[in-house]
Amino acid sequence: MKKINVGIVGGSGYTGGELCRLLLKHKNVKKIYPTSRSEQTFERTHLGLTNSNLNFIDVESLISKKKIDVVFLCTKSSQSIEYAEIFLKKKITVIDLSGAF
């Protein structure tokens, strides 16, 4: 099976952190791109995930990436609706964990 690149919008929250924890152990995940507007590092935000080698990026950087296979939305419902439209137009699979859909 092909390894996939995953984006996580809202990667600094509890849901985003737990999703990162699960995906770090998944054999078919190549790269994880968690997003955050925070100035803190990933490891400082998610203390239980030290040595993960993950770094936050901003949403605009995730949107502009070329090789994203799936995006998880771990945001408020109103934000998920907005971001889902953007990623779906780029033909990227979207999984919404906000409950908006």
Task: Locate predicted features.
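N-terminal Rossmann-like NAD(P) cofactor-binding subdomain of oxidoreductases
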Residues: M1-F101
